[in-house]
A protein has these predicted regions:
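Short amphipathic alpha-helical segments, especially helix-boundary/capping motifs
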Residues: 6-12, 63-67, 94-99, 130-132
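Flexible, acidic/Gly-rich N-terminal and inter-domain linker regions that tether
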Residues: 1-61
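Active-site cofactor/substrate anionic-group-binding motifs, chiefly glycine-
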Residues: 40-95, 166
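Conserved, mostly hydrophobic/aromatic
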Residues: 10, 33, 64, 103, ...
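Short, charged low-complexity intrinsically disordered segments located at boundaries
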Residues: 31-35, 59-68, 149-154
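Conserved Radical SAM active-site core
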Residues: 73-168
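Surface-exposed loop/turn and secondary-structure junction residues enriched for glycine/proline
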Residues: 16, 24, 29, 57-59, ...
Length: 168
């Protein structure tokens, strides 16, 4: 059975076959992915959403080696969006048909749980139709530790403030 048939029928590919996919032509990969999708949902329907990604800051205490956007001394200038700037971007997203806001910004030393709750409440009050897909798990841990509360309590407070889901 060739790799296209395996993928379309939900079969497992070998490590060598998976590596070979890196060199496959883009349209061939798309064709294989579509064949797999059709095997799972023969209706032929597909969907999408209009999502706005807002990185509210690139100031981060973690300084992860893999991160491509955090401020690096002398290389990338730090920035932090104001709450009003974030709200303006939300409005722009809604005007363009946006239905979801993804909000992330790292472990900012000045931002705590109370800030996040206030921001989410302002966004939900102004744009109740936006699905708020907000804050990475590491940001949530940062907020919980800063507030001296359990992670579950932090998640509950963010949800109560308007968070709909968490990325990652």
């Amino acid at each position: 059975m060739d790799i296209s048939d395996k993928i379309a029928n939900g079969g497992r590919v070998s490590e060598a076959e998976a590596l070979a996919l890196f060199d496959a032509p883009l349209f061939e990969l798309g064709r294989m992915a579509d064949a797999r999708r059709r095997s799972l949902d023969p209706s032929g329907e597909a969907g999408y959403i209009v999502n706005r990604m807002v990185n509210y800051s690139n100031v981060c205490k973690a300084m992860c080696a893999f991160c491509a956007y955090h401020a690096k001394a002398g290389k990338i200038s730090p920035y932090t969006l104001s709450d009003d700037e974030i709200l303006r971007l939300c409005g722009d997203a809604v005007e363009r048909g946006g239905v979801q806001l993804m909000l992330q910004g790292g472990l900012h030393p000045d931002f705590r749980l109370e800030w996040a709750e206030g921001l989410l409440r302002r966004i939900k009050a102004a744009y109740p139709e936006l699905w708020l897909h907000v804050f990475s798990p590491s940001e949530i841990v940062w907020f919980a530790r800063g507030a001296g509360i359990a992670i579950a309590d932090c998640v509950r407070r963010l949800k109560d403030a308007g968070a709909d889901s968490v990325p990652g």
